[in-house]
Design a protein with these regions (language model features):
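An extracytoplasmic/periplasmic, membrane-proximal ligand-sensing/linker region
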Residues: 203-205, 306-334
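A bilobed periplasmic-binding-protein/Venus flytrap-type ligand-binding module shared by bacterial periplasmic
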Residues: 153-160, 197-199, 267-278, 297
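Extracytoplasmic ligand-binding site segments that recognize negatively charged/polar headgroups
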Residues: 52-67, 78-96, 100-234
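Periplasmic-binding protein-like
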Residues: 135, 150, 178-188, 209-213, 218-220, 289-310, ...
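Immediate post-signal peptide segment of exported/extracytoplasmic ligand-binding proteins
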Residues: 36-52, 70-71, 175-180
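A ligand-binding cleft/hinge motif common to bilobed small-molecule-binding domains
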Residues: 110-115, 236-256
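Short amphipathic alpha-helical coupling segments at ligand-binding clamshell hinges
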Residues: 65, 204, 208-211, 277-289, ...
Length: 334
């Protein structure tokens, strides 16, 4: 018995030593492998010399981001093209039909994902930065990762509506009090429709939007101009991106917002072209957008970053409320 215990102790000790050595090897070898991979990527990018970036993010913000990237990697030049979501998707598809594959990286709206996947226009790439991003915001097959998100919330003009009178739930928003041009809705808020279908089921979501439409809301495309009209008092309520409303609130405008739960959070994915002319530079830029540095730039723009170690400004933009993620790979937005 004594001998067995001693031998057992020896094996336990040996096992402990081997385990510790394994940990040491992992700690030493993995960073070395990552550095080697980074060095290979950078070397390849140097030979390519440029990256072509298509985006729907505003031109001033996109230009600032690409300028900072070029400072970090002075051997690369970024060619930037910016337009809206629909026109950008049309541009990519039209170019592909004509045999042109000019772009490397694209940031756009979630509804771009399926058309690009179906036409085999996206490359699969899992960025090492994705480990700092919620799994819901990273595609399992590597075709996209959320770059930033937008949450649809209810905003109001504080001069026209008292806080205690603001609807706090989706059902409260259906009160006949808000009938007749009292609510502003985006004509292209497909992500919100899809998100509530995901949360509630198709039948309940469609029934809800029919009841909302019966209130005769003010219909207009986009967010920025609609929020400006809210500030001007054109209507008392709006469903819009919280970041757009928050920018005006931070400037002292008479507007505020709250989340109707679950708030639908729309993904703005970053993707790499399957036939990227500069594949190494594309991956380097992709990693940069998702890095802590790249995500902190988004915070500076008052957009909503997706990294766990980068808080939005203010944090309430993506903290303190329940949300449901829009599925960029949804095939049925209606």
């Amino acid at each position: 018995m004594t001998t067995f215990r001693i031998e057992g102790g020896i094996w336990m000790a040996l096992g402990s030593i081997m385990w510790k050595r394994a940990i040491v090897l992992v700690v030493l070898i993995l960073p070395a492998l990552c550095c080697a991979q980074d060095a290979k990527l950078i070397e390849g990018a140097k030979k390519e010399g440029q990256v072509v970036y298509y985006t729907t993010m505003t031109l001033d913000q996109s230009k600032h981001t690409t300028d900072q990237f070029e400072k970090k990697y002075p051997f690369l030049k970024v060619t930037l093209f910016r337009t809206g979501g629909g026109p950008l998707l049309n541009k990519i598809l039209t170019e592909a039909r004509g045999g042109r594959f000019d772009w490397d990286v694209v940031v756009g709206r979630g509804e771009m994902v399926i058309p690009l996947i179906d036409r085999k226009l996206l490359a699969s790439y899992r960025s090492p930065e994705s480990k700092m991003i919620d799994a819901q915001l990273v595609d399992d097959e590597g075709y996209w990762t959320a770059y930033y998100v937008n949450s649809y919330v209810l905003g109001w003009n504080t001069k026209l509506v008292k806080r205690e009178d603001v609807p706090k739930t989706y059902d409260a928003l259906l009160n006949p009090r808000w009938k007749g041009g009292q609510i502003s809705l985006d004509t292209e808020a497909y992500g919100m429709v899809e998100g509530l279908k995901r949360a509630w089921g198709r039948e309940k979501a469609i029934a809800y939007f029919k009841r909302l439409a019966a209130l005769d809301p003010v219909l207009k495309r986009g967010n920025t101009e609609r929020v400006q009209l809210l500030v001007a008092g054109e209507y008392p309520l709006i469903i819009a991106y919280n970041q757009t409303i928050q920018r005006m609130t931070s400037r002292g405008a008479p507007v505020d917002w709250l989340a109707l739960e679950p708030a639908v959070t729309q993904v703005n994915p970053v993707m790499i072209a399957a036939k990227a002319p500069h594949p190494n530079a594309a991956r380097l830029f992709y990693d940069y957008l998702l890095s802590k540095e790249g995500q902190e730039q988004l915070r500076g723009y008052q957009r909503i970053p997706v990294r766990k170690d980068v808080e939005p400004d203010p944090p309430r933009l993506f903290r303190g409320f329940k949300y449901t993620i829009e599925n960029p790979e949804c095939r049925d937005y209606l």
